[in-house]
């Protein structure tokens, strides 16, 4: 039987990418409050959330980042006890002045490395002050929960391991969280207490209010537990709660504060593509409401990954983008954006799709070396409106539908006194794992120029034999830049493992300067 803990890795590989991408060679620049530092926390961004008049929040594998000026500058938060959880940020949700975040880190266990809930945090004042909330756990004796006047049997979740909050949804009254083994919970007192919410079993399509619940709410694999009790995504508004699990899409209608009536849609009783539901979103346009879900194959051989959608409240379903692994959604009136493993798709009718090319920044001479687009948001607060994306290799925004991009990444400066004048990252570099685009990995050799110049990159092996010589590149303005290398020699053959030396030559105003740095290649 397939274990459902492992599909989560596809999202948390973002944090692994961070280890190679967002390392720091020097102490980051502290801000006045000593709780934040300048720049992005990491280059792997899984969620972008807009708040207030100008704030953008970024969930990265290295922590929480914020821009208060539409990307002109960024600050990031140190993990601080009683304030910000450690590790990567697995989810963000904002409502008015309130923002919630959740953290994740890896724990080493007997069966390997497993994602672990690092807890949550909230701010009531747009992120100025934060309160930490421990990852919700149960006492070993908490085997029952009062629900709809009945005592419902729950398996106590006593560890944060596999109890990771992957999604948060806010209403004026509740914060809802989906925490995989921790199930679906909600709080009406800012995390001082949590209420566990029962969902239908794998064998049931409906769970009515007033119905006696005879099974245990248990996230273990069948036959001991139910895949439908593993919560991965949640979306709440009004009296409606949508929950995505490892066994389908659950539509809940709150009939009272103590009961939610559930109807479950899965690949066996409806036309959704698969039962593992990793993302959900609601599009409202011109009086029409469409519900979107990224649905992956779970256990049945008849399931497949695609985007599932319903425009009649779940009564009927259809699929689109068959074969695509979805991550997230964004909307701009009638326009739909779908973030996938293949890149960012756009549609004006929800049926016919265009795929964006990978983002390139002609001003900074940067490319996002990642097909994976994990998140997107359309921000109309800044004229004329921008589309933001988050990838495994950085974030970017465009105001002209992808013709021009501005790319933002975190790396150590090469122009500050005491910092290296040139360096390679990631280092060590794996051409088969790092920054994969069009089948090639990429390493960047970062440097700065004081003005207009021509630069040329050359790579030598340990015996100082030339293996690669790049074309001369013309740079028109002072600044920091990076030359990419795909780990191949001049004949197009991937180089062997070993130590290599990178030579960067700068020609400016008739003078030539040469800089060297060392690079280790490990496939």
State each model region's role.
Residues 416-458, 510-512:
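Glycine-centered coil/turn sites that cap beta-strands in beta-rich domains
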Residues 499-523:
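C-terminal tail/sorting-segment detector
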Residues 32-65:
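Beta-strand-rich domains and repeat architectures in extracellular enzymes and scaffolds
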Residues 22-35, 65-77, 81-82, 117-136, ...:
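Asp-box/BNR beta-propeller loop motif
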């Amino acid at each position: 039987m397939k274990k459902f803990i492992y599909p989560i890795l596809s999202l948390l590989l973002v944090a692994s990418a961070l280890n190679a991408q967002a390392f720091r060679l020097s102490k980051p620049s502290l801000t006045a409050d000593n709780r934040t530092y300048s720049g992005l926390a990491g280059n792997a961004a899984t969620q972008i959330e807009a708040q207030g008049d100008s704030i953008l929040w970024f969930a990265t594998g290295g922590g929480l980042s914020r821009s208060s000026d539409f990307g002109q500058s960024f600050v990031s938060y140190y993990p601080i006890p009683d304030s910000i959880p450690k590790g990567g940020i697995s989810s963000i949700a904002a409502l008015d002045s309130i923002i919630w975040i959740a953290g994740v880190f890896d724990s080493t266990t007997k069966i390997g490395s497993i994602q672990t809930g690092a807890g949550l945090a909230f701010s009531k004042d747009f992120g100025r002050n934060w309160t930490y909330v421990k990852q919700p756990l149960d006492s070993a004796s908490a085997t029952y929960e009062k629900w709809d006047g009945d005592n419902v049997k729950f398996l106590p979740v006593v560890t944060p391991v596999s109890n990771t909050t992957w999604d948060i949804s806010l209403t004026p009254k509740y914060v809802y969280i989906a925490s995989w083994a921790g199930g679906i919970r909600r709080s009406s007192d800012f995390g001082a207490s949590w209420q566990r919410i029962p969902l239908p079993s794998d064998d049931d399509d409906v769970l009515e209010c007033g119905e006696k619940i005879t099974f245990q709410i248990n996230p273990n694999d069948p036959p001991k537990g139910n895949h439908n009790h593993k919560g991965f995504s949640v979306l709440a508004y009004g009296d409606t709660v949508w929950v995505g699990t490892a066994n389908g899409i659950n539509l809940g209608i709150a009939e009272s504060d103590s009961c939610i009536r559930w109807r479950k849609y899965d690949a066996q009783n409806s036309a959704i593509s698969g039962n593992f539901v990793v993302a959900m979103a609601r599009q409202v346009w011109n009086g029409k409401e469409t519900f979107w879900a990224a649905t992956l194959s779970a256990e049945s051989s008849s399931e497949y990954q695609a985007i599932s959608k319903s425009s009649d409240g779940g009564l009927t379903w259809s699929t689109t983008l068959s074969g695509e692994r979805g991550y997230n959604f964004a909307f701009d009136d009638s326009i739909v954006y779908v973030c996938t493993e293949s890149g960012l798709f756009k549609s004006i009718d929800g049926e016919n799709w265009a795929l964006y090319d990978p983002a390139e920044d002609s001003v900074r001479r940067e490319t996002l070396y990642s097909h994976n687009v994990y998140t997107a948001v359309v921000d109309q607060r800044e004229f004329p409106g921008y589309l933001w994306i988050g990838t495994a290799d950085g974030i970017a925004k465009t105001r002209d539908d992808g013709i021009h991009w501005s790319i933002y990444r975190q790396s150590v400066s090469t122009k500050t006194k005491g910092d290296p004048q040139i360096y390679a990252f990631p280092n060590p570099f794996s051409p088969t794992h790092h920054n994969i685009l069009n089948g090639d990995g990429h390493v960047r050799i970062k440097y700065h120029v004081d003005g207009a110049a021509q630069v040329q990159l050359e790579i030598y092996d340990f015996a100082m034999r030339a293996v690669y010589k790049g074309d001369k590149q013309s740079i028109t303005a002072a600044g920091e830049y990076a030359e990419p290398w795909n780990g191949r020699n001049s004949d197009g053959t991937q180089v062997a493992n070993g130590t290599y030396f990178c030579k960067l030559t700068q020609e400016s105003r008739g003078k030539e300067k040469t800089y060297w740095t060392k690079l280790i290649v490990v496939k």
